[in-house]
Amino acid sequence: KDNFCYICSSHFLICHFLMNSFLYRIASTFYQHHQDKLNAFTFVFPNRRAGLFFQKYLSEITKKPLFSPEIITIESCFLQASNLELADKLSNLFKIYNIYKTISKSNESFDTFAFWGEMLLADFNEVDKHRVDARQLFTNISELKEIDTFFEVFTENQVLAIQQFWKDFEPSRRNASRDQFVATWSILFPVYEQFKKELLSEGLGYEGMIAKWVTDKLLNNEDIPWFNDKQFVFIGFNALNPCEKVLMTELQKKEQADFYWDYEAPELRDNNNPASLFFKENTRQFKSKYEIKPQAESLDNTQIELIEIPSSVGQTKEIYHILNALYPKNEENSFLNTAVVIPDENLLLPLLYAVPEHINKINVTMGYPMQFTPVAGLMEDRKSTRLNS
């Protein structure tokens, strides 16, 4: 069978690919070279799904029982190296709320703060992952004279553009919105610093904080026992953040790292194609020890069929027929090479109901809003009953 995909009125994408995949060929290469010594390696992947498929391919290739190598995600790699525990997101939200209230002297309720607090946690995470100087980033810009001078240079069109996002923006005068913005911005670094300090004292951290903690120690040549006597193989990465680059670079210097990049598609090797942005940099800086055999089946042979269907309900019903036609019933692992991609999360439940009955194992890798679940509907009905009784 060739590679192929069906596109149903631009809503659903069903892809099927052959078994001779990138991960399969890497598993085969390492088995050929090491066989009984595979457990000496730690294979690191961008996500858990890739690691699970790599482990599956290893089990198919091996002819005899052997000790499995360690297969982890990049987040798990940082976590195990740090000896810290990953803090619970809800606990982090309460912690940063209390810190914010203490530093800002605010009486803001948790309900009001929660939405902004989640964004703050996400920003702190990105700051650390990208190894940004937080003190410089969260610069105190409370000197209103400088702000007013900055705002006054805007043209009328620029002011109108800003007002689309900040409706109270008025460069000619001070207002409560601007004062609140300045007051909030001025305390972000103290909040960030105190938040990390409290987490560290409890042996906790969030992903970005843990990654930065590990890479800081590596750059300072401090010993991290977990890395000792390990050989790491990084597989399938693309857009590396600064923490990941530091980790790979430092392990490479110690001859403890090997790298494999999935850049076989012609588009990824075309310098004029934006998709090739990371190709040259990654393959030049992080080279592979073994040459991986190219995919036997060219991606140029991919068959694409467009199916025009006017409604979402009709699309889900068509998927039932497509999946039924792809594989015979009771064929073991027949759907492991098939992906159904939906851009609209509201169609997830109708899609699940449309899956043929003989498919009893499905891996759903997208989120689904609680408000659309049957439980949420039940709770809404109970609330309505209580209010109207």
Feature roles, as predicted:
Residues 5-386:
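Nucleic acid-machinery interaction/catalytic patches
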